[in-house]
C-alpha cells in the first residue's frame, strides 16, 4: 500500500496524525513543510494520498497543492485548516478540505475512503 504523506510544519500535529493513522495500519511518511514534501515527490517516492496543513512558512497549502497537481491530477489531497474561509483558496483544485481539529476516527475513515474507493457493482 502506498504511504500517506503528512505535510505539517508543526511536529506535534504531524506526529499525532501519524500515530493515529499508523494505529489503523496505514504507512505514513512525514514532511516538515512544503519544500520537503515536493522533494519527496520529485524523487519518485510513491504516495497514495497527501494530508497537508493550510498555513505553513515558506510555502502555504494553496501553492503546495498547485505544485502537486502539476505532478499528479489524481492524487487525493486533504487540506486541514482552522480557518473556515481558507477553503475558498482551493476552488477548482479537487481537494478535500477539513476544519481542524479533525476527530481521529474521521481522519481514519477519510483516509480509508480515499485510498480504497468503493467500486460500482452491477446487480
Q: Can you name each region flagged by the protein language model?
A:
Residues 102-115, 119-122:
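C-terminal output helix
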Residues 56:
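Receiver (REC) domain active-site loop signature in two-component systems and cognate sites
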Residues 53:
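Active-site residues of response regulator receiver
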Residues 10-14:
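Short acidic/polar segment at the start of the alpha1 helix of CheY-like receiver
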Residues 30-39, 61:
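Helix N-cap/capping motif at the beta->alpha junctions
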Residues 15-23:
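Charged docking surfaces used in two-component/phosphorelay signaling
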Residues 80-81:
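Hydrophobic/aromatic residues positioned on beta-strands within the core alpha/beta folds
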Residues 39, 62-73:
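Short amphipathic alpha-helix used as the core "switch/output" element in two-component signaling
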Amino acid at each position: 500500500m502506498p504511504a500517506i504523506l503528512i505535510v505539517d510544519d508543526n511536529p506535534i500535529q504531524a506526529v499525532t496524525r501519524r500515530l493515529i493513522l499508523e494505529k489503523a495500519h496505514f504507512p505514513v511518511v512525514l514532511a516538515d513543510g512544503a519544500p520537503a514534501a515536493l522533494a519527496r515527490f520529485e524523487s519518485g517516492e510513491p504516495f497514495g494520498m497527501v494530508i497537508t496543513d493550510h498555513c505553513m512558512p515558506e510555502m502555504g497549502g494553496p501553492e503546495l497543492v498547485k505544485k502537486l497537481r502539476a505532478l499528479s491530477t489524481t492524487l487525493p489531497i486533504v487540506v486541514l485548516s482552522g480557518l473556515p474561509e481558507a477553503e475558498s483558496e482551493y476552488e477548482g483544485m479537487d481537494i478535500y478540505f477539513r476544519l481542524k481539529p479533525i476527530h481521529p476516527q474521521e481522519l481514519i475513515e477519510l483516509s480509508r475512503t480515499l485510498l480504497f474507493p468503493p467500486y460500482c457493482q452491477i446487480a
